[in-house]
């Protein structure tokens, strides 16, 4: 039974990821005044399937000097962790209702760093290694602010369980009282998922393709799937934290519709940002975090700690 539940979660995720790549190419196309993929199937709808067949039937080449075990394990680990992070997400019911769901997700996203580091190091290529080191530094740095923002939100929530966030936001979405946190959270999720304008890891001009430069065929596809699964997962988390998950004041019954609409809007914003902004310089990226975001989030965290005490209010109890 649990296996069926697991499959009923994994298969839709992989399908969503496949069509997200198509949506991205279409949006980028129209924003650059051209059409996206439109040959395979009606309006290019079957393009992701063609891409998958092409990638998985190609020969998985491997550099002679690479460390075989790590080279093969890295993409598998990346995808496994990306899918594991979906387990505590309430949509509207989680696969496993964890008591410390948010901590579990933070821990899993920290482990994802190892997949990137292994792939860069095992490739035995200087480009891959530099890309991996950049990715690791960026991910670890932005996790600091993500954790502090989460803490601030949880002070209004009262527990580490994601399901209680939905109860907290029945009357007011948390984006209204804590919009500065929400803005910094969104920018940090962009950096955490290595998306433009923070995609320093795959700076084509200097690093060819970043940490996955030596990968081809199937293993490359696994990294690709992991990246896009993380994007959707982060947007679902943002929806749950700040946008009241599946609550809507006008249509409270339409759980799934509300939830999917909010997540899709956030995902489209990710793609819109990618099409609009140039890449940051690496020192600017670090400056933004350590000198702008970190002091701000710490100050706001102190503010959120003092709020319930001064207002003599308690968060919803579970």
UniProtKB/Swiss-Prot annotation:
GO terms for molecular function: NADH dehydrogenase (ubiquinone) activity. It holds the Pfam family NADHdh. GO terms for biological process: aerobic respiration. It comes from the Eukaryota. Its EC number is 7.1.1.2. It is a multi-pass membrane protein. The chain crosses the membrane at residues 2-22, 70-90, 100-120, 147-167, 171-191, 217-237, 254-276, 294-314. It is found in: Mitochondrion inner membrane. Keywords: Electron transport, Membrane, Mitochondrion, Mitochondrion inner membrane, NAD, Respiratory chain, Translocase, Transmembrane, Transmembrane helix, Transport, Ubiquinone. It catalyses: a ubiquinone + NADH + 5 H(+)(in) = a ubiquinol + NAD(+) + 4 H(+)(out). The keyword Protein biosynthesis does not apply. Its main location: mitochondrion. InterPro entries: NADH_UbQ_OxRdtase_su1/FPO, NADH_UbQ_OxRdtase_su1_CS. The keyword Mitochondrion applies. GO terms for cellular component: mitochondrial inner membrane. Belongs to the complex I subunit 1 family. PANTHER family: NADH DEHYDROGENASE SUBUNIT 1, NADH-UBIQUINONE OXIDOREDUCTASE CHAIN 1. Core subunit of the mitochondrial membrane respiratory chain NADH dehydrogenase (Complex I) that is believed to belong to the minimal assembly required for catalysis. Complex I functions in the transfer of electrons from NADH to the respiratory chain. The immediate electron acceptor for the enzyme is believed to be ubiquinone. This is NADH-ubiquinone oxidoreductase chain 1. It comes from Tadarida insignis (Oriental free-tailed bat). The gene is MT-ND1.
